C-alpha cells in the first residue's frame, strides 16, 4: 500500500516538475518568448543534428539538461542526463538515451534524504523481520520434549526441526541478495514473509515427523531472505557514518529474536492448557503483523528501483521510450547473478585470510550461542532442577547482555566520529577499517571468560545466579564481536562486501544448525563443565583475531588485490 502511494506520488511530482521546466510552463499561449532553458534545448536539438550551437557556448548535448523528445517537444527534466547508448549497453540501438537519476543531492526521492523520523520508522518496522525469523528459528527448540513424545522419535531427532531451519537459512543466504536488487525490497519482504507464514502453518499442522522437518526446512529457506534484505534496507537509507549506530539496532533485533522466543516457547511447552504446537501459531501471528506493517507503512527504499519507477513514469508521461534507468540496462541476467552470488562467497572464504578468520570467529560464537538452545536444559534444568518454563526464562541474562552492548553504541559512535574528524583535519580521506574493531576488542576477552565462568560455577552447591550473570557477559561479548566483524568486512571489501558477509552468514548458520544436534549428546556425555571448557578453549584461540587485525590489518590489505 505504501509503495503504491509512493509510486502515484512520484507520478504527480514528475508531472508538475516537467510542466514547470517545460517550454510553455509560464503560460498557456504557445507564442510566448522562449526562455534560456528553451534556447539551450534548441541548441541540443541542433547539436544532435550536427549543427553548431546558437549561443556559441559549444556545450556537449551529453552534459546539458535540455531534452528534445521524439515529437519535437522541448523540455527540461531534473535528474536526467543524455548519454550515448554505446557507452552503456551494446544491445541498445538508439543513438541517445535519457538516463534517469536523482534530481540532486537533496532529492527527497532518494531515501538517504528522508527525515530522521521517517528513516527510523522504516528501519524499526523492517528490523522486526530480523527478530521474527530469529524467533522462528529457535522457538521449536523449547518444545523438543513435547515434539518427540508426539511423533515418537528421539530427542536428538526432534532437534532436527531447529537444525534444518538453520541449515536452510544458510543455504538460502547464498541466493537471497540478487532478488531484492532486481525487484526491490518490498516485494521480497511481502512475498517471502507470506511464504514463511504458509510453511509455518504447515509445520504447526504437520501430521508426522517427516512433514514437520520438510516444512521447517522450507520455512527457513524463505525466512532467510527478509533477514538478508533488511540489512540492505538499512544501507539504502543511512549513510556510512549514520550506520555506525543504525547497524547495531539491526544486530540487536536479530539477536533478541532467537533468545526471546525460548522465554515464551518454554512456557507453551510446559502448559497443560494449550498445545505445544502453539509455538508455531505464535510465530504465524507475529509474521502476519510484521507483513501487514510492511505492506501498509514501509515505502520502497532501493534507489535503483525507485529510478526505474521514475523512468517508467517519464516514458508514460512524455511518450518517449528513451528514458531509462541504469538498472534497466543491466546486461547480466538474474541467473548469472545468482551463480555469482553462490560462488563468490566461497572464493573469498578460501582465498581471503580476513574473511576466513572472521568467519571462523563467528562460527565459534554461533556454535556456542545456538548450542545453548538445547544446552540450557543441562545447565539450569538438570543442574538446578528448573522447570521447563524457568529454563526458558534464564535466557533473559543473555538478552540483557545484548542490550548492555547496545547501550555502548553512543560511546562507540561519538568516539568514531571524533577520530574521523581528526583524520579529515589532518588531511586524510577517512579512517582505516581497523578502527571498526574497537567493539570487538572490548567484547572478545569476555567470550572465553564467560564460558569458563559458567562452566565451573554450574554446581548445585553454587547459586544459579553465577552462571546466569556469566550469560550476561556472554551476550555482551557476542554482540560486540558481531557488530565489529560486519562493519569491518563492509569497510574492508566495499564492492565485495555483500559476498564477504554472505560467506560469514552461510558458514555460521550451517555450524549453528549442526551444533543444535551435537550439543545434546555433547552435554550429556561430557557434562556441563567439560563441554563449556572445550568451547571456552576454542574461543581462546580466536580471541586474538580482532587485536591482530587492528595492528596488522593495514599490512594485509596492502597485499590484497580485493581490498582498497
UniProtKB/Swiss-Prot annotation:
Name the record gives this protein: MFS-type transporter kojT
Membrane topology: Multi-pass membrane protein
Protein purpose: MFS-type transporter; part of the gene cluster that mediates the biosynthesis of 5-hydroxy-2-hydroxymethyl-1,4-pyrone, also know as kojic acid, a by-product in the fermentation process of malting rice that acts as a chelation agent. Involved in the secretion of kojic acid. Improves the antioxidant capacity via the accumulation of kojic acid that is also a strong oxidant.
Family annotation (SUPFAM superfamilies): MFS general substrate transporter
Protein's organism: Aspergillus oryzae (strain ATCC 42149 / RIB 40) (Yellow koji mold)
Family: Belongs to the major facilitator superfamily.
Keywords from the named record: Cell membrane, Glycoprotein, Membrane, Transmembrane, Transmembrane helix, Transport
UniProt-recorded Gene Ontology molecular function terms: transmembrane transporter activity
Membrane spanning residue stretches: 120-140, 159-179, 187-207, 217-237, 249-269, 278-298, 353-373, 389-409, 437-457, 462-482, 500-520, 530-550
Glycosylated residues, chain numbering: 113
Phenotype of null mutants: Reduces secretion of kojic acid. Leads to the declined expression of kap6.
Known uses: Kojic acid can be used for several biotechnological applications, including use as an antibiotic, as an additive to prevent browning of food materials, and as an antioxidant. Kojic acid is also interesting as an inhibitor of tyrosinase. Finally, kojic acid has also been shown to have strong nematicidal activity.
Major location category of this protein: membrane
Gene from which this protein is expressed: kojT
Upregulating conditions: Expression is controlled by the kojic acid gene cluster transcription factor kojR. Expression is also positively regulated by the secondary metabolism general regulator laeA. Finally, nitrogen deficiency also positively regulates expression. Expression is also regulated by the kojic acid related proteins kap1 and kap6.
A Gene Ontology term for the protein's cellular component: plasma membrane
One biological process term in Gene Ontology: kojic acid biosynthetic process
Amino acid at each position: 500500500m505504501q509503495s503504491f502511494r509512493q509510486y502515484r506520488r512520484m507520478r504527480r511530482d514528475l508531472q508538475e516538475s516537467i510542466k514547470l521546466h517545460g517550454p510553455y510552463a509560464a503560460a498557456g499561449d504557445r507564442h510566448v518568448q522562449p526562455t534560456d532553458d528553451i534556447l539551450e534545448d534548441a541548441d541540443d536539438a541542433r547539436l544532435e543534428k550536427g549543427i553548431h550551437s546558437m549561443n556559441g557556448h559549444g556545450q556537449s548535448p551529453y552534459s546539458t539538461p535540455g531534452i528534445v523528445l521524439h515529437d519535437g517537444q522541448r523540455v527540461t527534466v531534473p535528474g536526467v542526463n543524455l548519454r550515448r547508448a554505446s557507452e552503456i549497453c551494446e544491445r541498445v540501438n538508439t543513438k541517445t538515451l535519457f538516463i534517469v537519476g536523482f534530481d540532486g543531492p537533496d532529492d527527497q526521492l532518494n531515501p538517504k534524504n528522508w527525515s530522521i523520523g521517517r528513516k527510523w520508522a522504516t528501519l524499526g518496522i523492517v528490523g522486526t523481520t530480523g527478530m521474527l525469523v530469529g524467533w522462528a528459528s529457535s522457538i521449536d527448540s523449547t518444545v523438543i520434549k513435547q515434539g518427540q513424545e508426539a511423533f515418537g522419535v528421539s530427542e536428538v531427532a526432534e532437534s532436527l526441526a531447529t537444525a534444518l531451519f538453520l541449515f536452510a537459512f544458510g543455504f538460502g543466504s547464498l541466493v537471497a541478495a540478487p532478488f531484492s536488487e532486481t525487484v526491490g525490497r518490498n516485494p521480497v519482504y511481502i512475498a517471502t514473509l507470506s511464504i514463511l507464514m504458509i510453511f509455518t502453518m504447515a509445520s504447526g499442522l504437520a501430521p508426522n515427523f517427516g512433514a514437520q522437518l520438510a516444512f521447517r526446512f522450507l520455512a527457513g529457506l524463505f525466512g532467510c531472505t527478509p533477514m538478508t534484505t533488511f540489512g540492505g534496507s538499512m544501507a539504502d537509507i543511512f549513510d556510512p557514518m549514520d550506520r555506525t549506530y543504525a547497524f547495531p539496532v539491526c544486530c540487536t533485533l536479530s539477536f533478541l529474536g532467537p533468545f526471546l522466543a525460548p522465554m515464551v516457547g518454554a512456557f507453551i511447552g510446559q502448559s497443560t492448557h494449550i498445545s505445544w504446537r502453539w509455538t508455531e501459531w505464535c510465530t504465524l501471528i507475529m509474521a502476519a503483523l510484521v507483513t501487514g506493517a510492511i505492506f501498509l507503512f514501509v515505502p520502497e527504499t532501493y534507489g535503483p528501483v525507485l529510478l526505474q519507477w521514475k523512468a517508467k513514469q517519464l516514458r508514460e508521461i512524455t511518450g518517449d521510450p528513451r528514458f531509462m534507468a541504469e538498472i534497466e540496462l543491466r546486461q547480466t541476467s538474474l541467473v548469472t547473478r545468482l551463480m555469482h552470488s553462490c560462488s563468490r562467497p566461497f572464493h573469498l572464504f578460501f582465498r581471503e585470510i580476513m574473511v576466513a578468520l572472521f568467519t571462523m570467529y563467528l562460527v565459534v560464537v554461533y556454535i556456542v550461542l545456538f548450542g545453548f538452545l538445547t544446552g540450557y536444559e543441562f545447565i539450569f534444568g538438570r543442574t538446578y532442577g528448573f522447570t521447563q518454563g524457568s529454563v526458558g526464562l534464564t535466557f533473559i541474562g543473555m538478552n540483557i547482555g545484548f542490550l548492555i552492548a547496545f547501550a555502548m553504541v553512543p560511546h562507540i559512535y561519538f568516539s568514531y566520529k571524533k577520530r574521523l574528524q581528526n583524520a579529515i583535519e589532518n588531511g586524510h580521506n577517512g579512517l582505516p577499517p581497523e578502527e571498526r574493531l574497537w567493539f570487538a576488542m572490548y567484547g572478545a576477552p569476555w567470550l572465553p571468560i564467560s564460558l569458563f565462568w559458567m562452566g565451573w560455577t554450574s554446581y548445585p552447591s553454587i547459586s544459579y545466579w553465577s552462571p546466569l550473570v556469566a550469560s550476561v557477559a556472554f551476550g555482551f561479548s557476542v554482540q560486540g564481536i558481531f557488530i565489529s566483524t560486519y562493519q569491518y568486512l563492509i569497510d574492508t571489501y566495499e564492492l565485495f562486501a555483500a559476498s564477504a558477509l554472505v560467506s560469514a552468514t552461510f558458514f555460521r548458520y550451517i555450524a549453528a544448525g549442526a551444533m543444535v544436534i551435537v550439543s545434546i549428546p555433547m552435554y550429556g556425555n561430557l557434562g556441563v563443565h567439560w563441554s563449556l571448557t572445550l568451547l571456552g578453549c576454542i574461543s581462546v584461540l580466536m580471541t586474538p583475531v580482532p587485536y591482530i587485525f587492528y595492528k596488522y590489518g593495514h599490512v594485509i590489505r596492502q597485499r590484497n588485490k580485493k581490498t582498497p
